Design a protein with these regions (language model features):
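Surface-exposed, charged/polar loop-rich segments
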Residues: 93, 107-212, 290-294, 469
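Structured nucleic-acid-interacting core domains from mobile-element enzymes and related host factors
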Residues: 1-59, 90, 291-301, 307, ...
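Core residues of folded domains in eukaryotic genome-function proteins
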Residues: 28-34, 44-48, 55-59, 83, ...
C-alpha cells in the first residue's frame, strides 16, 4: 500500500504528464487561460487550485496548501507567477481568479511583471453577485423583493426541518423542496422556481386533514405561529404573483449564468450576451416599472464595469457572426438597433487597448492593425462571397481557420483570443474531486500526495474524452466512480453530473406560471406583512387601501400573462418581516 501511494503514484503522475503533451503542446497555437480558485479542505486547511484551460480542454496543474500563509495578494501573485513560468508566460493570455480585492491585487502584480497577460474576474461569479444585488435592492420601494425571498426561504426551512410536516408534503409532491445554499450559483432563481413548481402540492398539504391535526398538536405559541405563517404564505395569492414576477426579470441573469458556466471558449459572445440580457430585463420590467428597471440597470452596469476587460472587447470584434447582415437586421432585445462591434466607441477603445497589450513591438503592431483594417472593411480574403456567407454558419474559430491565413498576424491573435474561457468553474469542480480523494476517511494523506491523486484523477477525465485508448480500455472509463457509493452502478455517476444535476434542470417556468391558483376553502385571517415602505406589485393589504401596491389591475394582468381574475385576499397585518442585510463574501 505504501509503495502504491508513493513510487506507484509518482510513476502514474509522470505517465499522465506525458499523455497530456498532446494538449499542452497546442497551447503554443491557442494560448491558455490560467484559472485559479481557493477553498478549504476537510482538515480546515486553505487550498488553491491552478488549472490551464484552452480550446483543447482543461488540464489540472497544481494545488497549493496555504495554511501557513494568509491569502494576501503577494502570496497569490507569487503562486500564479510560478505556474506561468513553468509553462511559459508568453503563451498565457489571461488569468481568471476570484473577484475579491486581494485577487484583483494579485492580478495587478501579474500584469505588472507580464504586461501581455490580462486579469479577468470570473463571469459566473460576477453574475451570481448581480442576481444577489437585484434581490437585495435597498431602495425602500423595492425591499419587498428581498422580503419575498426571505419569506419563501422561511417556508422551505420550516417544512424541511419539521419531519412530520415534511412527511405530509412528500405525500403530495414528487418533487422535493430545495434548500439551496448561498454558495450555489443562481440560488435565488432555483429557490423561487422550485417553489412555483410545488405550489399546488403546498396548497394540498395545508388543506389536508393531516396538516390541521399537526398544527392543532403544536404545544408552544411559537410553533403555532410558525404553522400559521407557512399556511398564510401558501394561500397568499399575492405572494405567488410576486414570485412569478421576480422570476421573470431574474431569468435572463440565470440563463446568462448557464451560458457562461462552461469550459468552452465563449469569450467572443460575452459582450453581446450581456447586452441581450439587459435588453430582455428591460422588455420585462421597463413597461411596468421604469424606476425598478433603472435600479437593475445600475446594478448590471456596476458589475460589468468591475468585470469588463479589453480582452472581451477584442474577442467581440473578432467574432465574424456579429458582422453578418442577418444578425445586424434582427432587432436587439430592449428595442436597441444592432451595429457592427467596432463602431461602438466603448468597444473600439477596448480592442485598441487589448492589441497594444498583446503586441508590444511597434512594427508588429502596425502590421497587425493593417490586417485588422482589411477584416473590418471586408477586403481581401475577408470580402469573398464564401467568407461573408460563412460568418454566421460556422464557429468563429472555424471561420478564421478557413479564411484568416492570408493575414497571419491577425489570424494568430484571433485563434489565441477566441480560444479563451470566461469563468473559474473548472477550478471549483476540483473541490469535488479533492473531497472524494481527501475525505475524512483518507485524511492521513498529506497535501502533496492528495494533490498528486487529484492531478491523476482530474486529468484522466480529459484523457478519457479524447484518447482513442479510453474508448476501449475500461480502466480509463470507470475511474470516475464515487468512492463512497457502495452500489457501483449508482456510483458511476460522473462528478460533473453530480455537480450540474441541480443547475441543469429543464426549465419549465412557463408551465409553472400557467398553473392555476390552489382551489381550497382555507383563507387565513392574518398574514405577515412586508416591511414599511415596501410596495410589491401584488400585495395583500387591509383597511380600504388599494389591493395592488404599484400599478393597477392591468399591470397585474401583464405581469402574470393573463387576465387578473384571481381575487386579492385582504388581511390585517400582524408581523413585519425583517430584511436580511448580510452581504455575501466576494
Amino acid at each position: 500500500m505504501t509503495k502504491a501511494r508513493t513510487v506507484g503514484l509518482d510513476k502514474e503522475k509522470a505517465k499522465i504528464q506525458n499523455a497530456l503533451g498532446q494538449f499542452t503542446n497546442a497551447w503554443n497555437e491557442y494560448g491558455v487561460s490560467i484559472v485559479s480558485d481557493g477553498w478549504t479542505n476537510v482538515k480546515g486547511k486553505p487550498l488553491i487550485n491552478v488549472l490551464g484551460v484552452s480550446a483543447t480542454g482543461v488540464v489540472f496543474l497544481s494545488a497549493h496548501d496555504y495554511s501557513d500563509k494568509f491569502k494576501i495578494d503577494n502570496n497569490i501573485g507569487e503562486l500564479l507567477l510560478k505556474n506561468f513560468e513553468a509553462i511559459g508566460p508568453y503563451i498565457v493570455i489571461q488569468v481568471i481568479i476570484d473577484n475579491a480585492a486581494n485577487c484583483k491585487a494579485a492580478g495587478a502584480i501579474i500584469e505588472d511583471k507580464y504586461p501581455n497577460i490580462f486579469w479577468s474576474g470570473c463571469l459566473v461569479h460576477t453574475l451570481n453577485l448581480l442576481m444577489h444585488d437585484i434581490i437585495k435592492i435597498k431602495e425602500n420601494d423595492y425591499r419587498w423583493i428581498g422580503a419575498l425571498y426571505k419569506k419563501g426561504k422561511h417556508m422551505i426551512r420550516f417544512i424541511t426541518n419539521h419531519s412530520n410536516a415534511h412527511g405530509i408534503f412528500r405525500t403530495h409532491s414528487k418533487l422535493e423542496l430545495l434548500k439551496v445554499g448561498k454558495t450555489r450559483f443562481a440560488s435565488y432563481y432555483l429557490t423561487f422556481r422550485r417553489l412555483l413548481k410545488v405550489r399546488e402540492a403546498l396548497a394540498s398539504m395545508v388543506s389536508s386533514e393531516s396538516w390541521q391535526v399537526l398544527k392543532d398538536r403544536a404545544t408552544s405559541t411559537f410553533d403555532r405561529r410558525q404553522f400559521q405563517e407557512v399556511e398564510d404564505t401558501v394561500l397568499d395569492t399575492a405572494f405567488w404573483k410576486n414570485v412569478k414576477y421576480v422570476l421573470q426579470f431574474i431569468k435572463p441573469v440565470y440563463y446568462m449564468i448557464r451560458f457562461a458556466d462552461t469550459d468552452k471558449p465563449v469569450i467572443g459572445e460575452v459582450y453581446e450576451q450581456m447586452d441581450s440580457m439587459l435588453g430582455q430585463i428591460k422588455d420585462i420590467v421597463d413597461p411596468k416599472d421604469p424606476i425598478l428597471y433603472k435600479h437593475i440597470h445600475a446594478q448590471v452596469v456596476k458589475r460589468w464595469d468591475h468585470l469588463n476587460v479589453p480582452l472581451h472587447a477584442l474577442a467581440y470584434v473578432l467574432t465574424p457572426k456579429y458582422y453578418s447582415p442577418s444578425w445586424l437586421a434582427k432587432p436587439a432585445p430592449g428595442g436597441m438597433e444592432r451595429k457592427k462591434p467596432h463602431t461602438d466607441s466603448e468597444v473600439q477603445a477596448g480592442y485598441m487597448t487589448a492589441i497594444d497589450k498583446l503586441v508590444s513591438d511597434p512594427d508588429e503592431c502596425d502590421y497587425l492593425r493593417s490586417e485588422l483594417s482589411k477584416y473590418l472593411s471586408e477586403l481581401g480574403p475577408f470580402g469573398t462571397l464564401h467568407a461573408k456567407r460563412d460568418r454566421d454558419r460556422v464557429s468563429s474559430m472555424e471561420w478564421w481557420t478557413m479564411y484568416g491565413s492570408p493575414c497571419p498576424r491577425l489570424y494568430k491573435m484571433a485563434m489565441r483570443v477566441l480560444s479563451q474561457v470566461v469563468n473559474s468553474s473548472s477550478a471549483e469542480r476540483c473541490w469535488s474531486t479533492y473531497s472524494f480523494i481527501h475525505s475524512v476517511k483518507r485524511n492521513r494523506l498529506n497535501e502533496n500526495r492528495a494533490e498528486s491523486l487529484v492531478y491523476v484523477h482530474y486529468n484522466l477525465r480529459l484523457l478519457s474524452h479524447y484518447c482513442e485508448r479510453a474508448k476501449t480500455d475500461r480502466s480509463y472509463v470507470t475511474w470516475d466512480n464515487n468512492p463512497e457509493e457502495h452500489n457501483l452502478e449508482d456510483g458511476s455517476l460522473t462528478l460533473e453530473r453530480l455537480e450540474q444535476e441541480l443547475l441543469g434542470e429543464e426549465d419549465d417556468l412557463a408551465a409553472a406560471a400557467a398553473m392555476p391558483p390552489p382551489t381550497c376553502s382555507l383563507f387565513p385571517s392574518d398574514a405577515p406583512a412586508l416591511p414599511s415602505g415596501s410596495r410589491p406589485p401584488f400585495a395583500s393589504v387591509s383597511g380600504g387601501r388599494a389591493g395592488v401596491g404599484r400599478g393597477s389591475a392591468a399591470l397585474a394582468s401583464r405581469a402574470t400573462g393573463g387576465d387578473d381574475t384571481t381575487p386579492i385576499v385582504h388581511r390585517p397585518r400582524e408581523k413585519k418581516l425583517e430584511i436580511s442585510r448580510g452581504k455575501r463574501k466576494h
